[in-house]
């Protein structure tokens, strides 16, 4: 479950000069509302991440949530982890997100410890991992950093370990791509966002979020050496994949 938050009104008034989107204090305050109203199927993905973790986590192993934001995926996994000696390492480079994540994590009791770290995920060591989650995070890295991070994750996964990668997708067929973008905008309108909010948010985020196609993701997985990989969830141009070592 996601923590409650204030309503997202960040882009509701006209902005003269729209800067790049950042996960700052303002965004952290409204993030649960923002992501529920912006990402189709988000709650389903969070719930299923917990179920996948339950299947794949091994005793005395590490579980990583890279780009943890407020800890929704971390909390979902922690509810499902029954194995002994496991710890969740939740990492985000936003101080505002990390501070709130710690509050959310500490609000629930569990036998599985969670270590919330403020750091750049590109500089985190991945060791003895049975589960690694990148939930709408990879798309914010530069294209050249994505392969390097995935290689590091693969090296740090135990055999049989799983990477769960949720992303926004771009589609190679132009008609399909435009249709799915339009459907996503319809989804946002249905959730109360105005045309101004949709337009300004898109302008703010287009320079910092550069989505890949599913084909690009699968090609990377194959090149790195993952044995099995596929899409397990998709709604419009958002989805989630698994890759097993």
Swiss-Prot record:
Claim: Transferase is one of the keywords in the record: yes
Stretches assigned to coiled coil: none
EC nos: 2.1.3.-
Binding site for S-adenosyl-L-methionine: 42, 67-69, 92-93, 120-121, 135, 202
Assigned keywords, A-Z: S-adenosyl-L-methionine, Transferase
Pfam families recorded: Methyltransf_25
InterPro entries (alphabetical): CmoA (IPR005271), Methyltransf_25 (IPR041698), SAM-dependent_MTases_sf (IPR029063)
Domain of life: Bacteria
Enzyme class, spelled out: transferase
Gene3D superfamilies in the cross-refs: Vaccinia Virus protein VP39
Catalysis: reaction(s): prephenate + S-adenosyl-L-methionine = carboxy-S-adenosyl-L-methionine + 3-phenylpyruvate + H2O
Molecular function, one GO term: S-adenosyl-L-methionine binding
SUPFAM superfamilies attached to this UniProt entry: S-adenosyl-L-methionine-dependent methyltransferases
GO BP of this protein: tRNA wobble uridine modification
Function: Catalyzes the conversion of S-adenosyl-L-methionine (SAM) to carboxy-S-adenosyl-L-methionine (Cx-SAM).
Family membership: Belongs to the class I-like SAM-binding methyltransferase superfamily. Cx-SAM synthase family.
Assembly: Homodimer.
Protein name (record): Carboxy-S-adenosyl-L-methionine synthase
Source organism per UniProt: Vibrio vulnificus (strain CMCP6)
Designated gene of the protein: cmoA
């Amino acid at each position: 479950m996601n923590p409650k938050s204030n309503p997202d009104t960040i882009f509701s008034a006209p902005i003269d000069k729209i800067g790049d989107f950042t996960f700052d204090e303002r965004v952290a305050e409204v993030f649960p509302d923002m992501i529920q109203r912006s990402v189709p199927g988000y709650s389903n993905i969070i719930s299923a991440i917990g179920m996948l973790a339950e299947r794949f986590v091994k005793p005395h192993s590490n579980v990583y949530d890279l780009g943890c934001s407020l800890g929704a995926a971390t909390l979902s996994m922690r509810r499902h982890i029954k194995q002994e000696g496991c710890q969740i390492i939740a990492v985000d480079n936003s101080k505002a997100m990390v501070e709130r994540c710690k509050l959310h994590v500490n609000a629930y009791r569990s036998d599985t410890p969670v270590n919330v770290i403020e750091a750049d995920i590109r500089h985190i060591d991945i060791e003895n991992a049975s589960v690694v989650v990148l939930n709408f995070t990879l798309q914010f890295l530069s294209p050249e950093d994505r392969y390097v991070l995935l290689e590091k994750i693969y090296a740090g996964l135990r055999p049989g370990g799983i990477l769960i990668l949720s992303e926004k997708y771009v589609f190679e067929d132009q008609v399909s791509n435009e249709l799915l973008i339009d459907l996503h905008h319809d989804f946002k309108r249905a959730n109360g966002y105005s045309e101004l909010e949709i337009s300004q948010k898109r302008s703010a985020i287009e320079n910092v979020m550069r989505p890949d196609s599913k084909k690009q993701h699968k090609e990377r997985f194959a090149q790195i050496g993952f044995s099995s990989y596929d899409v397990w969830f998709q709604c419009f141009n958002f989805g989630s994949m698994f890759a097993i070592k």
